[in-house]
């Protein structure tokens, strides 16, 4: 990918420029509710007029709530799993179109199960790098989170956002075509077929 994009480790508030695509994966959980407005303002300001943003975040399908004290202490200090309602309002206030919202229900439970299986398959390598306490804690984290996604209303949200409501075709069909890698705006007239 190095010839197609540039990777920089920096605060999202320090990014400058204009982009045709913005992708945020696993970061929104660390922004904090008081900063959602500024976050989506940044997304809007950084998008070109016909640009598209994809915000991929762990979320809750319940109303807003608190984060597990154990997760806050040992895994994601300062992290918070947002309810969809907490993200939608600041998106609307920034006049961004939610051109698509996808909710992955059990997908991440399966991902966590695979991570646990791989961790256990490599437990001796992990123990060579980390103490037993850490290995037990990591295993507990993977199992507990899998169960949370499977039974306690944890999901993954994918918000597709744009400044213009016609930035993408009307349906998701363009995502599944063989030529999906091409500029999606070229296929707008095919959206209703």
Tell where the protein language model's regions lie, with residue ranges.
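Hydrophobic/aromatic anchor residues within beta-strands of the central parallel beta-sheet
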Residues: 2-7, 53
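A short acidic, Gly/Pro-enriched loop at the edge of an enzyme's catalytic core
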Residues: 8-23
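Short SAM/SAH-binding signature in class I
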Residues: 19-29, 38
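Substrate-binding/catalytic lobe of Class I Rossmann-like enzymes that use SAM or dcSAM, i.e.
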Residues: 58-169, 183
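Short, cationic low-complexity segments
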Residues: 174-193
């Amino acid at each position: 990918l190095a010839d197609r994009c540039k990777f920089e480790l920096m605060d999202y508030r320090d990014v400058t420029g204009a982009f045709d695509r913005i992708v945020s994966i696993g970061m929104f959980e660390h922004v904090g509710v008081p900063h959602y407005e500024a976050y989506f303002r940044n997304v809007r300001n950084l998008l070109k007029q016909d640009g598209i943003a994809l915000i991929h975040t762990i979320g809750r399908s319940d109303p807003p709530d608190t984060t597990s004290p154990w997760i806050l202490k040992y895994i994601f200090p300062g992290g918070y799993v947002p309810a969809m309602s907490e993200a939608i309002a600041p998106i609307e206030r920034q006049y961004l179109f939610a051109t698509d919202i996808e909710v992955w229900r059990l997908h991440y439970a399966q991902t966590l199960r695979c991570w646990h299986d791989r961790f256990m398959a490599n437990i001796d390598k992990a123990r060579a790098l980390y103490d037993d306490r850490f290995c037990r804690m990591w295993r507990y984290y993977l199992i507990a989170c899998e169960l949370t996604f499977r039974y306690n209303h944890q999901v993954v949200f994918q918000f597709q956002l744009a400044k213009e409501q016609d930035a993408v075709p009307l349906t998701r069909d363009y995502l599944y075509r063989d030529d999906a890698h091409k500029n999606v705006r070229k296929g707008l007239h095919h959206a209703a077929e």
